[in-house]
Amino acid sequence: MLAQSIRDCILWIRKTPDRALRAAKEAADLYQNIQQESRIYQNLRGANDATVILYLDKELSQYERTVKLRLQEFRVSSALLRGFEASQTESAETKKMVEEIEMAISRSQFLRSILSASSVKTHKPLAFEKTGIIPRSIPRTFDRLRRELLASSEDLVVQEFRISRYQTLTSLKFLASLIWIPWIVSWFLRVWWLEPTITMFWNQDQTQLFLHRSQEERALSDMRAFQEKVYFEVLVGEAPDPTPEVLQRRIQAKARDLAEASNQNSIESLANLGSDILACLILLAMLSLEKTKIAVLKSFLDELIYSLNDATKAFFLILVTDVFVGFHSTHGWEVILELLFAHFGFPESKKFIFMFVATFPVLLDTVFKYWIFRYLNHISPSTVAVYHNMNE
């Protein structure tokens, strides 16, 4: 059994060059397929979709890196295993395959040439185009009829479906990464670095027991509730009348428990603040580095939103406004602020909460109404009409 395992391991190691070369060949074939599909799509459309071009260029870059890494793996493993096997014929065939892969990657950098600043700057979302003398729907209708009457309209539909699939997959993956990567990284840093560091410095250098006045008031309130519970149990006969020494020990034990709980709560509050700051920094770094995927995600969300009918759009508008700026939204904002204060360990301020609830929803409602008047009227007047009718 051991000898067979050793032979299998040796065989797997000796096949590393072939395995790396096959992986490089597969990545090069996918690279060429994406290039061909994007070229056909551009010829049929007669125009460059900057978002699609950005995404396909990103895909080509990934496959190109895969090919280079696999070829490097092939060269290194071949150099280390040289002399084990491989005849001159096999070496010649392998060399020919490597040259074909390198030529396929270096040939025809199609998307790199059309991905320029001018093409990206001149591209604007369809829903935000400025209105002119002729309504936008008329030229769009003629353009749609022209493309449907072309002999290559079926190819256009297939290519648009593939491009849409690319766009949807990368949008969902990027959206999931924006949610999970900052949370996972910040959680890992909190557990293994931030919280132990805060615990060490807090327990060594901190002289005061409580982080702020509100925390002290909660501890005192819990202490009074414990004392009242003890006396109540004695009065109703659920517990025997304790001696002063026993009562003092119980009160001291409860005080130590409350002190330890308050100390741990202070450490967790500081750790929450630090980990959330780290998560925000990671999110900002991702947004600044992944501008290509942001453009793809924005295009995907635009298509998703504008594909809804007017009644559905109006329904979501009413839902959002009623939740955040509606009559009962003040209670929701109060709960959110109290949760944030407890999460970060900030002292609760009723005056600040009342002032925030009295001003922020009003400001948000004003901004929303201005957005409807300034932008939504030009983008989708029918949605605005349905929205007002549903509100009435």
UniProtKB/Swiss-Prot annotation:
Reactions catalysed: K(+)(in) + H(+)(out) = K(+)(out) + H(+)(in)
Location in or out of the cell: Plastid, Chloroplast inner membrane
Protein topology in the membrane: Multi-pass membrane protein
Main localization of the protein described in the UniProt heading: plastid
Any GO BP annotation: potassium ion transport
Any GO CC annotation of this UniProt entry: chloroplast inner membrane
Transmembrane segment boundaries: 174-194, 269-289, 316-336, 352-372
Key words, A-Z: Antiport, Chloroplast, Hydrogen ion transport, Ion transport, Membrane, Plastid, Plastid inner membrane, Potassium, Potassium transport, Transmembrane, Transmembrane helix, Transport
GO molecular function: antiporter activity; proton transmembrane transporter activity
Described purpose of this protein according to its UniProt entry: Contributes to K(+)/H(+) antiport activity by supporting proton efflux to control proton extrusion and homeostasis in chloroplasts in a light-dependent manner to modulate photosynthesis. Prevents excessive induction of non-photochemical quenching (NPQ) under continuous-light conditions. Indirectly promotes efficient inorganic carbon uptake into chloroplasts.
Family: Belongs to the CemA family.
Protein name: Potassium/proton antiporter CemA
Natural source organism: Nephroselmis olivacea (Green alga)
Lineage of the species this protein comes from: Eukaryota, Viridiplantae, Chlorophyta, Nephroselmidophyceae, Nephroselmidales
